[in-house]
């Protein structure tokens, strides 16, 4: 929705803050509802002001504050990692990523594309570790979040 995009930009322009990441996905096609996950930083007062401003935007239905480190919240990012190199390098790269259960999306004699899902800092670390094994390209999502247990965020 153009109104929401403009409003989001205006909120951040007024606050003078940056968006670290933004993830948008339709969650209820029948009602035309999407979930937007915005990752930003700021003092508690700045975050509260951003929440208030976002809540005033039409057609925003609900605004919630999911704090990093909150054990009741699951945070994840997804990354696609392309590596170019010989079989030995690719196998070593897979071992580096093993704890994140990498999915091999594409594999040739000279390259491999992996998908991993992890916390932002874990992906940052893996990317650093993979440079010596031929990491040549990265595409990653912004963070997404969901509450644990039976609590529903509507």
Task: Name what the model sees in each region.
Residues 1-8:
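Single conserved hydrophobic/aromatic residue that forms the stacking wall/gate
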Residues 9-35, 39-154:
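Long, contiguous binding/interaction regions
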């Amino acid at each position: 929705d153009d109104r929401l995009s403009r409003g989001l930009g205006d909120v951040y322009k007024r606050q003078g803050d940056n968006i670290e990441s933004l993830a948008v996905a339709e969650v209820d096609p029948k009602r035309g509802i999407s979930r937007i996950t915005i990752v930003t930083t700021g003092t508690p007062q700045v975050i509260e002001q951003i929440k208030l401003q976002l809540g005033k935007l039409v057609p925003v239905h609900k605004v919630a504050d999911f704090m990093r480190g909150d054990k009741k919240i699951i945070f994840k990012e997804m990354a696609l990692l392309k590596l170019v190199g010989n079989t030995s390098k690719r196998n070593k790269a897979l071992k580096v990523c093993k704890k994140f259960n990498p999915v091999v999306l594409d594999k040739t004699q000279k390259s491999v594309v992996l998908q991993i899902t992890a916390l932002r800092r874990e992906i940052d670390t893996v990317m650093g570790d993979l440079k010596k094994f031929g990491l040549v390209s990265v595409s990653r999502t912004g963070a997404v979040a969901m509450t644990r247990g039976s609590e529903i965020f509507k």
